[in-house]
């Protein structure tokens, strides 16, 4: 079995997903400090902005995730005289072009998103001309079982997309929550997009807490 096949079949917990997303983001936005030290990566994982949900991970949790990911070919440690640093290997392990890597990173950090959200949030990371370019790359990821298309529920204006590398139970929880939200809007009126995102963040936070307890 090739490295690509092994990595592609892997499933990662919420902490590992946050670690990968943070490394991908900082490679693009802070190239002068990338690869990252463990301390810098912990700060990146726990950012209050551009993270859904906001997490409060320890160095031990991030270090454990890095070692697990290293064993799957998704991260690599660079030994240094002053400090050891970590880099991701997502693009190489999954054979992704730069545009696909950016989209996976955004979905790792913020979960299900619309095409317009991905376009807006990618402006510091990659130069997409429009949502059609994003949709084309997402369709390629979906064809390889790396991403999922989530049809809009009742009361929603747009479809959403998310990565498919998390725990299957977490993905099912997201889908179930969306179905429940859609039913609530049909019977009880409209619910704001902010409310939807808040519910998604609460679900993800509970899943992250469960992953911490199990770890």
Swiss-Prot record:
Species whose genome carries this gene: Pseudomonas putida (strain ATCC 47054 / DSM 6125 / CFBP 8728 / NCIMB 11950 / KT2440)
InterPro entries: DUF480, WH-like_DNA-bd_sf, WH_DNA-bd_sf
Highest taxon above the source species: Bacteria
One Pfam family per UniProt: DUF480
Family: Belongs to the UPF0502 family.
Protein name: UPF0502 protein PP_2442
SUPFAM superfamilies: Winged helix' DNA-binding domain
């Amino acid at each position: 079995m090739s490295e690509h096949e092994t990595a592609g079949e892997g499933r990662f917990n919420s902490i590992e997903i946050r670690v990968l997303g943070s490394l991908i983001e900082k490679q693009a936005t802070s190239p002068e400090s990338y690869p990252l030290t463990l301390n810098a990566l912990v700060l990146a994982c726990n950012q209050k902005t551009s993270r859904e949900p906001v997490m409060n991970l320890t160095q031990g949790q991030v270090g454990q995730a890095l070692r697990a990911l290293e064993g799957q070919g998704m991260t690599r440690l660079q030994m240094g005289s002053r400090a050891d640093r970590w880099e991701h290997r997502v693009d190489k392990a999954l054979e992704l072009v730069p545009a696909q890597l950016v989209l996976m990173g955004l979905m790792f950090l913020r979960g299900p998103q619309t095409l317009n959200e991905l376009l807006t949030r990618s402006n510091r990371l990659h130069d997409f001309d429009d949502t059609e370019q994003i949709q084309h790359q997402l369709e390629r990821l979906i064809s390889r079982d790396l991403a999922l298309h989530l049809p809009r529920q009742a009361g929603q204006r747009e479809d959403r997309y998310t990565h498919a590398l998390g725990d299957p139970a977490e993905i099912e929880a997201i889908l179930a929550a969306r179905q429940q939200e859609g039913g609530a809007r049909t019977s009880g009126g409209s619910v704001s997009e902010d409310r939807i995102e808040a519910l998604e963040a609460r679900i993800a936070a509970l899943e992250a807490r469960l992953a911490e307890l199990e770890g």
